[in-house]
Amino acid sequence: MIGSGSEHQTALIEKSPSKTALYKTDKHELLCTNHYQSDSFKNDKNNIANIATSASEYRYERLVELLKENPKLDYKSVAKILRDQKGKNGKNIGMGNEKAMNQLIAHHSIIFQPEKRRFWISTQPYQLGEYVCYDFDSIFAEAPSYNVDKEINDAAYTIPADSFLLSDGWKRFLTYKSSKEQIKASIKKKTPIENESAFIGQFLRSNPEEWETYYWTGELYRAEQNKEKAEVFYHQALTKEINDSSEVYKIKKLIKECNK
């Protein structure tokens, strides 16, 4: 995405190995998730397949909802949108779900205010830390003095860290992440998890609306040859908001294997 404050224009550069297109719109906003929108690409079979099978269109529709909730955007409301973890209609789809605006995986995000020549860069973790503001005019004006270490951000426009970082939800998400990695390691190394029953109970409580919580519990039981329990958790995973159709297909295939 590129923008010009002096021209009041924003556009998307869409690119594949064989062609490049510039997408613009006459609307007051230009939205983008992870699929092409230009005439050159929108009817491409790969793009159509991506829209049908990925989380991109779902996120786009959620973005439209959030813009309706925030009709007059400023840098703070944009940060709020980028940090949103809900699904469509505000549904709780679990923490870290790919269908959310904030999937709790991003290294950073950037907010630009071209007309005022300002930009904000998020700090760790996952767009939840402070957004630090920089002013292009002051940076370039003071450039000759940058021969010593000094802070060059505009602290007056810092966006505070998300209060989610102080919540029980954040603590549970950290538990969920570490527990999921422990399950993966147990499956890969074929080593048991100590106090497995208590461990699984804690894992399920840590992120109960996220489909992967149940999928990975099922995978752990499948690795232990406990197909009956694995099937129960695969079915539970299917009741949640799953990232894309390929994951749904995979889980349904695993359920069939459990019944062999």
Feature locations, PLM:
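Structured, non-membrane catalytic/scaffold regions adjacent to prosthetic-group chemistry
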Residues: 1-27
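C-terminus-biased signal that marks the final domain/tail of proteins
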Residues: 5-10, 30-232, 236-260
